[in-house]
């Protein structure tokens, strides 16, 4: 395994551990999710360029589009939660509450 692939897998794992560790605040969770998406993007670009799969060359761009949409929805949710409750705790996101 090449060194850069190992580094990207390590970055993904660290970001995943950050999501699991810092899940009390929404902003920390969003930052860790963005780190995961960035490492997935770099891994996908490296895999496609290494194996010369021309048919999959649009996949990293599609991943970036979904990542931007996820960030936009997450930030809109963060603004709404912080405006309504005054903080960004994930425990305020109880959607089953009547």
Swiss-Prot record:
Its EC number is 7.1.1.2. Coiled coil: none annotated. Keywords: Electron transport, Membrane, Mitochondrion, Mitochondrion inner membrane, NAD, Respiratory chain, Translocase, Transmembrane, Transmembrane helix, Transport, Ubiquinone. It is found in: Mitochondrion inner membrane. One of its GO terms (cellular component) is mitochondrial inner membrane. Belongs to the complex I subunit 4L family. PANTHER family: NADH-UBIQUINONE OXIDOREDUCTASE CHAIN 4L, NADH-UBIQUINONE OXIDOREDUCTASE SUBUNIT ND4L. This is NADH-ubiquinone oxidoreductase chain 4L. It comes from Monodelphis domestica (Gray short-tailed opossum).
